[in-house]
Amino acid sequence: MKRSAINDILGHTRQFFSQHDVHLPPFASFSPAQWQQLDTAAWEEVFDLKLGWDVTAFGRNNFAAHGLTLFTLRNGSAKGMPYVKCYAEKIMHVRDAQVTPMHFHWRKREDIINRGGGNLIVELWNADSNEQTADSDITVVIDGCRQKHTAGSQLRLSPGESICLPPGLYHSFWAEAGFGDVLVGEVSSVNDDDHDNHFLQPLDRYNLIDEDEPAQLVLCNEYRQFR
């Protein structure tokens, strides 16, 4: 991805969040120069847990079709130490018709919440013993209501609705085409993007970046430059 595209994406997402009255912590606005001036030891939790901005096209070259913009607000250590929080929270911007590819988590249990905008479509499959999609019915809980659906069902979440996804359940999601972008919340157990994501089709979690212009903000996988 080009840095200029990432700058534009983040600018658009910040506007979208503002339209939905979403307020982020101050470090969401820190430029690279501001990060350079900080006492990095005081910010180790942000660095270690990859709090902050994340822009990905999942290693592909078409962000509009396959991509996601998110901000991790809080998280804990995967093994419980040194950061003892047992929960995580993200806020996400899913653009109209933009797909997050099919994947599951080995350990993370998460609630995906449509906080506003258009409709969110979630496609669900059980994983078989070979980590492929299974033909068995899936069972999920939507806003406290336990439901059974056929394999590969695509469930529509309108604003205000949420779904609980257990570990090992394949899921892909996108904003329903023609209904606009979606503000998505995620509340979960500890998030570990380095070790707890399994994609049905192997892909890269982060994109290589072509530095065609200066970065306006810092992504969560770029903090190493400040340590």
Curated annotation (Swiss-Prot):
Known catalytic reactions: D-lyxose = D-xylulose; D-mannose = D-fructose
Span of the signal peptide: none
Alphabetized Gene3D superfamilies for the sequence: Jelly Rolls
pH curve summary: Optimum pH is 7.5.
A Pfam match: Lyx_isomer
EC number assigned by the record: 5.3.1.15, 5.3.1.7
Annotated binding of Mn(2+), by residue: 103, 105, 110, 171
Keywords: Carbohydrate metabolism, Disulfide bond, Isomerase, Manganese, Metal-binding
Entry GO MF terms: isomerase activity; metal ion binding
Subunit record text: Homodimer; disulfide-linked. Dimerization is facilitated through a disulfide bond between the two monomers of the dimeric enzyme.
Protein name: D-lyxose/D-mannose isomerase
Organism field: Escherichia coli O157:H7
Source organism phylogeny: Bacteria, Pseudomonadati, Pseudomonadota, Gammaproteobacteria, Enterobacterales
